């Protein structure tokens, strides 16, 4: 059983993608707004009927209904508004995430948690502390989205399908995220060998600004790409695929970092992020990575004491 906490745009889209991909046949939506998860669940059950899917959705306002879940996906939290940075959401969403984390520890103590709430890396830390889970079992959704965006923009410039590109994006899920063209490949050929320097710069800038651009255009943040990305991560966990994906996890010495969640390649399986993969970086890339880590550390230091 999978529980999705938060029935807004990202939560509902994620729930739909989970059903379409056949990740689980029982999905619970939980939200504090009465009627919202129940309405979404009913609509999703109608979708399942039309598509012939073997999945049943339940909506609830009670955290106790996550009992039995081996995977909990947390999409709850305040969303970014036009002109707002992920960092401005810090304190308000920290309280929301910490409260949800305590409920997860109570009702789904053996689960893996995938989190989408921004600012992502800081909220991954808050969730890790609130649940008391091992670092492997608290995974921030970030790199699948950032990597997908990099592949899209690079693919447009190359005139090839984004599916042909294996992208690498490291560091913070935010303004200091660090796409790595030298380690992003098209059949073994790095992007920085296929694109001109100015094209790489444009693709990287478009990747970094993509989320804000979507919010600016339509007045609310992204949901389709995050929903798809979370579902891909959930499938890797539920089916024990041992699939290498980019995610935010608390590092324990990898990349010379300890106790800070950072967007890095991991192997996702039934236990969560069962292995961190260390990418060899050039001196310049290491410097940029460290700058991104410092940005995350600064956010963590600004968290109220009760969330540390």
Swiss-Prot record:
Ligand binding (NAD(+)): 6-11, 31, 93, 116-118
Q: Which CDD domains does its entry note?
A: LDH-like_MDH (cd01339)
Q: Give the residues the record marks as binding substrate.
A: 80, 86, 118, 149
Entry EC no(s): 1.1.1.37
- Name the active site residues: 173
Which reaction equation describes what this protein catalyses? (S)-malate + NAD(+) = oxaloacetate + NADH + H(+)
Classification via PANTHER family: L-2-HYDROXYCARBOXYLATE DEHYDROGENASE (NAD(P)(+)) (PTHR43128), L-LACTATE DEHYDROGENASE (PTHR43128:SF16)
Q: Which family does it belong to?
A: Belongs to the LDH/MDH superfamily.
The name this protein carries in UniProt is Malate dehydrogenase
Tell me which species this is from. Answer: Thermoproteus tenax (strain ATCC 35583 / DSM 2078 / JCM 9277 / NBRC 100435 / Kra 1)
Q: Which gene encodes it?
A: mdh
């Amino acid at each position: 059983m999978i529980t999705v906490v938060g029935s807004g745009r990202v939560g509902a889209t994620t729930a739909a993608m989970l059903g379409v991909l056949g990740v689980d046949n029982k999905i619970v939506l939980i939200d504090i707004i009465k009627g919202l998860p129940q309405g979404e669940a009913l609509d999703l059950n109608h979708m399942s009927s039309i598509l012939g899917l073997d999945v049943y959705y339940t909506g609830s306002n009670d955290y106790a209904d996550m009992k039995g879940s081996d995977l909990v996906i947390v999409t709850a939290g305040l969303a970014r508004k036009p002109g707002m940075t992920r960092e401005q959401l810090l304190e308000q969403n920290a309280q929301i995430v910490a409260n949800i984390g305590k409920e997860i520890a109570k009702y789904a103590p053996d689960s893996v948690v995938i989190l989408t709430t921004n600012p992502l890396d800081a909220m991954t830390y808050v969730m890790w502390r609130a649940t008391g889970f091992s670092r492997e079992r608290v995974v921030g959704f970030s790199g699948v989205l950032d990597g997908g965006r990099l592949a899209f923009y690079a693919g447009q410039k190359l005139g090839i399908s984004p599916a042909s590109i294996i992208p690498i994006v490291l560091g913070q899920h935010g303004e200091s995220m660090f796409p790595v063209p030298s380690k992003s490949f098209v059949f073994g050929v790095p992007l920085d060998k296929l694109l001109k320097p100015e094209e790489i710069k444009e693709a990287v800038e478009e990747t970094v600004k993509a989320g804000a651009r979507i919010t600016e255009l339509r007045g609310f943040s992204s949901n389709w790409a995050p929903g798809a990305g979370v579902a891909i991560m959930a499938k890797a966990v539920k089916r024990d695929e041992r699939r290498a994906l980019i995610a935010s996890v608390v590092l324990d010495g990898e990349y010379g970092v300890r106790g800070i969640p950072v967007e890095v390649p991991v192997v996702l399986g039934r236990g969560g992020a069962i292995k961190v993969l260390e990418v060899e970086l050039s001196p310049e890339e290491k410097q940029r990575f460290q700058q991104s880590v410092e940005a995350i550390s600064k956010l963590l230091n600004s968290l109220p004491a009760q969330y540390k």
